[in-house]
């Protein structure tokens, strides 16, 4: 199960979906792709300053002074992981 915590100034994710064995888990791959894209987009397409920590099974993104453009990117990321969870039920929002 991937645990996702969202606050006004951060996103924290930890764990694995457990949908398939390591290296073949399409749920973990999809969540990772969306999250990497969020980090890259916030860094390159907005003026939002972020701090991102990533390790195996753990990601934390923090920011201050979120812009409207940054909020749209975070909302888009959230829509994506919500859709994944509706299909595979492997994400717990905490």
PLM segments and residue spans:
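N-terminal intrinsically disordered, cationic/polar leader segments
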Residues: 1-26, 33-94
């Amino acid at each position: 199960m991937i645990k996702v915590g969202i606050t006004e100034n951060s996103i924290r994710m930890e764990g694995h979906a457990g949908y398939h064995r390591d290296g073949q888990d399409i749920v973990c791959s999809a969540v990772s792709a969306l999250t990497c894209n969020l980090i890259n987009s916030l860094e390159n397409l907005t003026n939002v300053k972020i701090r991102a920590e990533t390790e195996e099974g753990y990601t934390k993104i923090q920011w201050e002074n979120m812009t409207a453009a940054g909020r749209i990117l975070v909302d888009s990321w959230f829509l994506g992981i919500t859709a994944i969870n509706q299909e595979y039920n492997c994400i717990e929002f905490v």
